[in-house]
C-alpha cells in the first residue's frame, strides 16, 4: 500500500508537470518542419476551418485565402522532403557550432543507423501481432523455467535457517540520492511507466520515502508484487540475418526505475564481500575485450617462442544467462558471509518476479520466472560473475594446461566467452573434462556445434600433428578443429598472423565509408571532421596487430587513404599527403602508433594479476 501510494504520487506529478503532445500524421518524420512548415501549416489550418465555418464557398476572398495558404503549405512540405539531406546536414552543423554535443551525436547516430526495416509479421510459424506475442510468451515461459531448482531451493533455506543473522542494512537518504544520480536518463521505463527523470527531479521528500521503503524491504525480506514485475522485449541480434528465426532474438528485461535504485544499493553492499576472479575480464572496471584477447595472445606467444604447440578451445554456452540457477548463487553469498537480510531479500525477489512480453503494441499474460538473470538488469553482471566463478576456480587450481611463472594461465573468460589453453592434448582433454563437470554442477549446457578447437604454433606448424592426435569431445560429441576463429571480435589464426583481422578491418572500413558518404555528403567540413574522428580513428583491435605481412599492412594504409579522400570529396588521384596536410588529419601510421601507445600504457600499468605476471615474467613480448 505504501509503495503504491509513492508510485501513484510520482505518476500524477509527472502527468501534471510534463505535457503530453499527440503527434498527428507524419509530422515527426518531416525534417525541417519547425523551421519551414509549421507556421504555414497553422495558417492553412485556420484558413480551412474558417472556410468550413463560412459554408465552404467556391468563390470569394475566404476561398482564395484557403486555397493560397494550402498551396504555400504544400510547397513548404515538398521543399523539406526534397532537401531532407541538406536540412539534416544544416541541423548537425548548427548543433556542432552551438557546442551541443549530445544533440549533435544523437543526430549522427540516428543518421548512421538509419535503415529500412520491414515489420515482421511471421516468426516461427506464428502470424499476426497477437499470435507472435503469445508465441514469445510460451517460448520465454519454457526457457525461464527449464532448470530444476527445487533441491537447491530447499538447501538454501536450510542453510539460511542455521546461520546467525546479522544486523539489518539501513538505507539512508544519501544512498538513495547517489543511486538515483548514477542512473542514466532517456532510458525506457518499466511496467509502471515512470521515467528516470521523475525520480531525479522529485527532490528530497521522495528520497526520504524511498529510503524508508527500502529499509522496510530489507528488514522483512519482502517486496510488493508490482515492484517485481518486468517487461521482456525481444530485440534482433543480427539485422541482416533471418528475422523469422527465434534464435536471432535476445530478451531484454525492462524493470521499474525504483527497482533499479534498489539494485544499485544492493550492488554497492554485496561487492564489498567479494573480489572477482582475475581470470574473468568481463563486467569489471578498466577491463576490456582487447585486454582479454591480448592476454590470450601473450600466453600463446610465451609457449610458441619455446617451440611448443598450444591447444586452444573456444567454449560456447547455450543460453548461459537465461539458465542460471540463482539459488546456487544465493547459497554462495551465504557462504561468503554476505548480510543474510540482503540474501533473503534477493531470494524472495527473484523467486516471485512476474514477467510479461511486449511485442509491438501487444502485451502477453504474466508468467513466473524460475531461473535466469535479467539481461539489462543492474545486478545481473555481478550475479553471473559469481555463478561462473566456481568453473574458473576449479580450472585455474587444477595445475593443468598453460602456466606462466607458476600462475595458471589456462583459462580466460569475458562474461560467458571462455577459452582454454593447454600445451598438450592430454592437458586439453583434462581441462574439457573439468569444465564439463562444472557445467553439470552449474546447469550450464555447452553448444558443441559452435565450440571450436585450434592448435597453434607460429614457428613450426607440423601438418602431421593435426592428423595424428585424437579429437576432443564434450558429452560424446566431437569438437571441430579450425585454423581461424573470431574471439571477442578479433580473428585469431593458427599461425598467429593478424593478416585475417587486418583484412576484416579493411572490409569494414570500405562499408563504413560508403555508408557515411551516403548519409553525410552534404554536411559542412567541421561536421565531417568530427564524424571522421569518431568513425575512422577508432579501429577495434588495431593495437593487437603484432605479426603481419607487409603487403597486408600496405593494403590497409591504401584503404585508409582512399576512404579519407572519398569521404571529404577529393579526387582519387589527389595526393594523400597533401590531403592530410590540408585537413590536418593523422595518417595511418600515426593512428597505428597512437593506438599501440595507449594500449601499451594500459598494459604496463594494469592491476590484473595475470596481466602483471605476463608483463613481469615474460619480457620479450610484442608489448615490451
Could you say what each language-model-derived stretch is?
Residues 166, 361, 445-483:
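Short, conserved micro-motifs composed of acidic
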Residues 7, 22-26, 30, 85, ...:
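Non-catalytic, peripheral interaction segments enriched in hydrophobic/basic residues
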Residues 317-415, 420-430, 449:
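Conserved polymerase palm-domain catalytic core
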Residues 1-125, 561-562:
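Arg/Lys-enriched, amphipathic patches
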Residues 190, 229-232, 250, 280, ...:
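Catalytic palm active-site di-aspartate
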Residues 186-194, 232, 244-254, 291-331:
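Conserved catalytic palm subdomain of right-hand nucleotidyl-transferase polymerases, strongest
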Residues 9-12, 99-246, 253, 257-261, ...:
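Surface-exposed loop/turn segments and immediately adjacent short secondary-structure elements
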Amino acid at each position: 500500500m505504501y509503495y503504491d501510494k509513492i508510485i501513484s504520487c510520482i505518476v500524477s506529478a509527472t502527468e501534471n508537470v510534463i505535457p503530453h503532445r499527440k503527434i498527428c500524421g507524419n509530422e515527426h518524420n518531416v525534417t525541417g518542419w519547425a523551421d519551414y512548415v509549421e507556421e504555414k501549416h497553422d495558417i492553412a489550418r485556420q484558413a480551412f476551418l474558417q472556410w468550413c465555418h463560412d459554408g465552404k464557398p467556391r468563390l470569394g476572398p475566404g476561398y482564395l485565402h484557403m486555397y493560397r495558404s494550402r498551396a504555400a503549405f504544400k510547397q513548404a512540405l515538398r521543399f523539406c522532403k526534397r532537401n531532407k539531406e541538406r536540412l539534416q546536414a544544416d541541423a548537425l552543423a548548427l548543433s556542432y557550432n552551438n557546442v551541443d554535443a549530445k544533440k549533435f551525436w544523437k543526430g549522427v547516430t540516428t543518421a548512421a543507423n538509419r535503415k529500412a526495416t520491414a515489420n515482421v509479421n511471421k516468426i516461427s510459424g506464428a502470424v499476426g501481432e497477437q499470435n507472435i506475442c503469445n508465441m514469445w510468451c510460451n517460448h520465454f515461459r519454457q526457457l525461464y523455467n527449464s532448470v530444476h531448482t527445487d533441491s537447491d531451493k530447499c538447501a538454501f533455506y536450510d542453510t539460511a535457517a542455521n546461520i546467525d543473522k546479522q544486523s539489518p542494512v539501513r538505507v539512508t537518504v544519501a544512498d538513495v540520492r547517489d543511486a538515483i544520480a548514477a542512473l542514466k536518463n532517456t532510458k525506457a521505463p518499466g511496467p509502471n511507466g515512470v521515467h528516470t527523470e521523475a525520480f531525479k527531479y522529485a527532490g528530497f521528500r521522495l528520497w526520504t520515502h524511498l529510503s524508508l521503503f527500502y529499509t522496510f524491504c530489507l528488514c522483512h525480506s519482502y517486496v510488493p508484487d508490482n515492484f517485481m514485475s518486468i517487461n521482456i522485449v525481444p530485440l534482433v541480434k543480427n539485422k541482416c540475418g533471418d528475422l523469422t528465426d527465434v534464435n536471432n532474438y535476445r530478451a531484454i528485461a525492462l524493470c521499474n526505475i525504483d527497482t533499479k535504485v534498489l539494485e544499485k544499493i544492493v550492488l554497492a553492499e554485496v561487492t564489498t564481500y567479494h573480489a572477482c576472479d582475475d581470470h574473468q575480464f568481463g563486467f569489471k572496471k578498466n577491463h576490456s575485450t582487447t585486454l582479454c584477447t591480448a592476454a590470450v595472445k601473450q600466453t600463446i606467444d610465451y609457449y610458441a617462442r619455446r617451440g611448443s604447440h598450444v591447444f586452444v578451445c573456444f567454449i560456447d554456452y547455450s543460453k548461459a544467462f537465461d539458465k542460471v540457477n540463482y539459488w546456487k548463487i544465493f547459497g554462495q553469498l551465504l557462504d561468503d558471509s554476505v548480510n543474510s537480510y540482503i540474501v533473503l531479500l534477493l531470494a524472495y525477489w527473484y523467486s516471485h518476479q512476474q514477467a510479461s512480453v511486449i511485442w509491438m503494441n501487444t502485451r502477453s499474460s504474466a508468467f513466473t520466472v524460475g531461473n535466469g538473470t535479467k539481461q539489462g538488469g543492474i545486478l545481473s553482471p555481478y550475479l553471473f560473475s559469481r555463478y561462473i566463478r566456481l568453473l574458473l576456480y576449479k580450472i585455474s587450481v587444477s595445475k593443468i594446461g598453460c602456466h606462466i611463472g607458476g600462475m595458471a594461465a589456462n583459462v580466460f573468460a569475458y562474461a560467458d566467452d571462455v577459452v582454454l589453453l593447454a600445451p598438450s592434448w592430454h592437458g586439453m582433454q583434462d581441462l574439457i573434462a573439468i569444465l564439463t563437470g562444472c557445467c553439470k554442477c552449474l546447469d550450464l549446457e555447452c553448444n558443441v556445434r559452435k565450440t571450436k578447437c585450434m592448435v597453434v604454433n607460429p614457428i613450426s606448424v607440423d601438418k602431421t600433428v593435426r592428423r595424428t592426435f585424437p579429437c576432443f569431445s564434450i558429452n560424446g560429441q566431437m569438437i571441430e578443429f579450425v585454423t581461424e576463429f573470431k574471439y571477442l571480435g578479433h580473428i585469431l589464426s593458427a599461425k598467429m598472423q593478424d593478416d585475417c583481422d587486418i583484412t576484416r578491418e579493411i572490409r569494414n572500413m570500405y562499408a563504413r565509408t560508403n555508408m557515411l558518404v551516403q548519409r553525410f555528403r552534404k554536411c559542412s567540413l567541421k561536421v565531417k571532421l568530427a564524424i571522421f574522428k569518431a568513425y575512422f580513428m577508432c579501429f577495434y583491435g588495431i593495437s593487437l596487430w603484432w605479426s603481419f605481412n607487409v603487403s597486408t599492412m600496405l593494403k590497409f594504409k591504401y584503404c585508409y587513404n582512399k576512404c579519407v579522400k572519398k569521404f571529404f570529396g577529393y579526387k582519387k588521384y589527389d595526393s594523400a599527403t597533401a590531403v592530410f596536410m590540408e585537413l590536418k588529419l593523422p595518417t595511418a601510421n600515426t593512428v597505428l602508433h597512437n593506438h599501440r601507445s595507449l594500449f601499451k600504457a594500459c598494459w604496463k600499468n594494469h592491476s590484473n594479476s595475470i596481466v602483471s605476471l605476463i608483463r613481469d615474467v615474460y619480457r620479450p613480448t610484442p608489448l615490451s
